[in-house]
Amino acid sequence: MVEAWYMDDSEEDQRRPHRLEPERPVSLAHLQQLGVFYWKLDADKYEDDPELEKIRKERKYCWMDIITICKDKLPNYEEKIKMFYEEHLHLDDEIRYILDGSGYFDVRDKEDKWIRIFMEKGDMITLPAGIYHRFTLDETNYVKAMRLFVGEPVWTAYNRPADHFEIRGQYLQFLAQKG
């Protein structure tokens, strides 16, 4: 099951867990209130997993590719790691399925505080369009992930501040309705 918690404000290595002291865990229900959805799947059979196919069909995830993030496999590794960790939003949902390795997605809550979500093999997550977030590897320095999209992939990230986008306003309205 996914593990999430509120982060400390430390400037130490971004790949460390950065848990508050005392810890403040975050439940799956709390993440859902932010529009973040999670599934646990069998990553060893992703190529012909009926559960993954069902999710893809229901949510119209019709395009996918696989990315491996590690020094040996990803061109311009250092530049990409910095780019992934820059706080940003997308105009479309971000859907990631961890096939191997591990890392962290950080998302902003309603009060603009960081929540860190630990992702490992078999974890699939959807971050809603308009949510400020970032990604980093953990101390293993390796993740292999499936990227899924509704329609043609759009790779554009809009670094904060990006509040002028209509999708950001829609996301804030969604949060307000959640109370």
Swiss-Prot record:
Entry annotated with the keyword Ribosomal protein: no
Binding residues for Fe(2+): 88, 90, 94, 133
Q: Where in the cell is it found?
A: Cytoplasm; Nucleus; Cell membrane
Task: Look up keyword Amino-acid biosynthesis and say if it applies.
Answer: yes
For this chain's record, the cofactor binding note is: Binds either 1 Fe or Ni cation per monomer. Iron-binding promotes an acireductone dioxygenase reaction producing 2-keto-4-methylthiobutyrate, while nickel-binding promotes an acireductone dioxygenase reaction producing 3-(methylsulfanyl)propanoate.
The pathway to which it is assigned is:
Amino-acid biosynthesis; L-methionine biosynthesis via salvage pathway; L-methionine from S-methyl-5-thio-alpha-D-ribose 1-phosphate: step 5/6
| UniProt record, GO biological process | L-methionine salvage from methylthioadenosine; methionine metabolic process
Q: Quote the EC number.
A: 1.13.11.54, 1.13.11.53
Q: What positions does the entry give for Ni(2+) binding?
A: 88, 90, 94, 133
Identification of the protein by name: Acireductone dioxygenase
Recorded source organism is Monodelphis domestica (Gray short-tailed opossum)
